[in-house]
Amino acid sequence: MSLVWLEAMLPLGIIGGMLCIMGNSQYYIHKAYHGRPKHIGHDEWDVAMERRDKKVVEKAAAPSS
């Protein structure tokens, strides 16, 4: 009777394992598709700043005539 709690550990372990597998698969799929890990807390402001930075770098790299 002292190992009754062990009966609940198997389903709990399966559920926890599946949650870990789902989280890791999302990470690796996103990394494979975008080429970099997902940014945590990445909002519209960060996206706008990335676009601005990309334009500035392209403008600086373009040959001036």
UniProtKB/Swiss-Prot annotation:
One cellular-component annotation, GO: mitochondrion
UniProt KW Cell membrane keyword: no
UniProt keyword list: Electron transport, Membrane, Mitochondrion, Mitochondrion inner membrane, Respiratory chain, Transmembrane, Transmembrane helix, Transport
Subcellular location: Mitochondrion inner membrane
Pfam family, one: MWFE
Superkingdom classification of source: Eukaryota
Membrane-spanning residues: 3-23
InterPro entries recorded: NADH_Ub_cplx-1_asu_su-1
Keyword Transmembrane: yes
Membrane topology: Single-pass membrane protein
PANTHER family xref list: NADH DEHYDROGENASE [UBIQUINONE] 1 ALPHA SUBCOMPLEX SUBUNIT 1, NADH-UBIQUINONE OXIDOREDUCTASE MWFE SUBUNIT
Subunit structure: Complex I is composed of at least 49 different subunits.
Family: Belongs to the complex I NDUFA1 subunit family.
Name this polypeptide is given: NADH dehydrogenase [ubiquinone] 1 alpha subcomplex subunit 1
Organism expressing this protein natively: Arabidopsis thaliana (Mouse-ear cress)
